[in-house]
Amino acid sequence: MAAQRELYDAIVIGAGIQGCFTAYHLAKHSKKVLLLEQFFLPHSRGSSHGQSRIIRRAYPEDFYTQMMAECYSLWAQLEHEAGTQLYRQTGLLLLGMKENPELKIIQATLSRQGVEHQCLSSEELKQRFPNIRLARGEVGLLEVSGGVLYADKALRALQDAIRQLGGIVHDGEKVVEIKSGLPVMVKTTSRSYQAKSLIITAGPWTNRLLRPLGAELPLQTLRINVCYWQEKVPGSYSVSQAFPCFMGLGLSLAPHHIYGLPSREYPGLMKVCYHHGNNADPEERDCPAAFSDIQDVHILSGFVRDHLPDLQPEPAVMEHCMYTNTPDGHFVLDRHPKYDNIVIGAGFSGHGFKLSPVVGKILYELSMKLTPSYDLTPFRISRFPSLGKAHL
């Protein structure tokens, strides 16, 4: 078949936000690129669906805050190219106890990196945001440039751009076999392809593709409950009322972050979620028998009742999303330990969407054997000492 003889510069497996930005950078640099997606687009099986994500520079680590500087400009560039709004500035409010160490570290990082922010006392918070109820000793850190990314619009814009730049997008094609070598061979349910390099951005399916290639990453796949809460007075927590996105840090009732953003999906509802979930195989994420524990919803109900009194304290809508977590919460951006023309982008741990413009650029650079634009030490596979040679 002609398709088998055709040689691509790169094949990208997985058309979530990371794979789309990787293919976009490849196509922008005039590379012959094929983007493969096992499901028909758009779909809600992975980690990139839905209408909204938080964008922020507020991180404890300098390297993420530095990467975000370029991400903001690349998001703006995509907005301009697509002729549609992909980002809305709302501000990001971090809530925590005054002595919370993570809050202090984030504030220090923002100061060091020259990111505009404001430290708000309990009194100032009450004046600025009267519909947030605070516990005694809670303070706020407002990152001015934080806001909302329109996730579904971003995916569509990228897929359109890839095609316009000459890239090829094939959905409804599941990869069934990868043969390492030069060229690398990729067999799907429809046909076979070959390429000089392969980039795997397969989210919770990553290890299914890596195991036959002699590698396995320490990835934990979680099903997240995405909860929407009804406003008692419509509009009280809306963008039009200048209500920000928020993150609750170090809360006594919640071992993990709680985050929220003004809802665009459902008018009159606000998205408030817990940054953790239950272990789940991505193939079985919709099986109710697998998920008896909805402790996170109880945690969220308590938070809403205590902090957001103008919301009903029970979720009105609950949807699902997948996280693919690493032990340290940092990404994997690296070449396969044995095959240097196979590149892996994985383990985005529930905070990768906003960083995808730079992640895609890095994966493009790795696949083309270019010097990466950023120090990849935090993202190397070798940081996992438990991965002995037997795994690789």
Curated annotation (Swiss-Prot):
Annotated catalysed reactions: sarcosine + O2 + H2O = formaldehyde + glycine + H2O2; L-pipecolate + O2 = L-1-piperideine-6-carboxylate + H2O2 + H(+)
Note describing how the cofactor binds: Binds 1 FAD per subunit.
Name of the top EC class for this enzyme: oxidoreductase
Gene3D superfamilies: D-Amino Acid Oxidase, subunit A, domain 2, FAD/NAD(P)-binding domain
Record flagged with keyword Flavoprotein: yes
GO molecular function: flavin adenine dinucleotide binding; L-pipecolate oxidase activity; sarcosine oxidase activity
UniProt subcellular location: Peroxisome
GO cellular component, as recorded: peroxisome
Keywords: Acetylation, FAD, Flavoprotein, Oxidoreductase, Peroxisome
Residues modified to S-8alpha-FAD cysteine: C321
Short motif (Microbody targeting signal): ranges: 390-392
Binding positions for FAD per the UniProt entry: 9-39
Cofactors: FAD
ATP-binding keyword on record: no
Protein purpose: Metabolizes sarcosine, L-pipecolic acid and L-proline.
NCBIfam families: PRK11259.1, soxA_mon
PANTHER family: PEROXISOMAL SARCOSINE OXIDASE
Protein name as annotated: Peroxisomal sarcosine oxidase
